[in-house]
Regions:
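N-acyltransferase acceptor-side catalytic subdomain
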Residues: 1-192
């Protein structure tokens, strides 16, 4: 599955338990700015009022499973949750979580390769918890020197934070630069 990400593809399981997992490339490709990420005023007010604690990788399987619950099994099926959990166990997939005390209120997960973070999806069980995870992700990626935040497709919600579409060619150029350190270390995409 990492090889697909290195080529700019992302999975969607529309084949059910028996059919193949299909890989896609969107046009335009949705990207979220890292340095120019913006928090809408209404979201900032909500986050100040709720003060979620942001944690990373403390409940990956729970986040992935919660994200699949909103999708009616359309693309994030149990076998993809299992695949992402294996990527997490290998150090490639990560979750960013919004907590209130010991209650997981929201989160997102994605795949990190080099300075690429490819967000898959997010969920919330409390007001602004998904937004808290999104803002937490922006701060984390910025602090760790990430250069490309792939969100696959822009939605009205992500556009409020500055997400925009780029051409597949531009995406592949930015992707190549973001994953170059990993490819240099590993030798080829087939080894990752």
């Amino acid at each position: 599955m990492l090889g697909a990400y290195l080529r700019g593809w992302f999975p969607m399981d529309r084949g059910g338990a028996e059919g193949p997992v299909l890989f896609y490339e969107s046009d335009p490709r949705g990207v979220m700015p890292i340095e120019d990420f913006r928090v809408p005023r209404s979201v900032a007010r909500g986050l100040r009022a709720r003060a979620y604690e942001i944690r990373v990788d403390t409940a990956f399987a729970e986040v992935a499973t919660a994200c699949s619950g909103d999708r009616d099994g359309e693309w994030l099926t149990p076998r993809l949750v299992d695949a992402y959990t294996r990527l997490h166990e290998a150090g490639w997939a990560h979750s960013v979580e919004a907590w209130s005390g010991e209650r997981l209120c929201g989160g997102l997960f994605g795949v990190a390769i080099g300075t690429l973070f490819s967000s898959e999806t997010m969920f919330h069980r409390a007001p602004d918890a998904g937004n808290a995870a999104l803002v937490g992700t922006a701060l984390l990626l910025r602090s760790r020197g990430f250069t490309l935040w792939d969100i696959q497709a822009v939605s009205p919600h992500t556009a409020r934070f500055g997400a925009h579409g780029i051409s597949p060619g531009d995406y592949r150029r930015r992707l190549a630069a973001a994953v170059a350190p990993v490819l240099a270390r590993e030798g080829s995409a087939s080894r990752v």
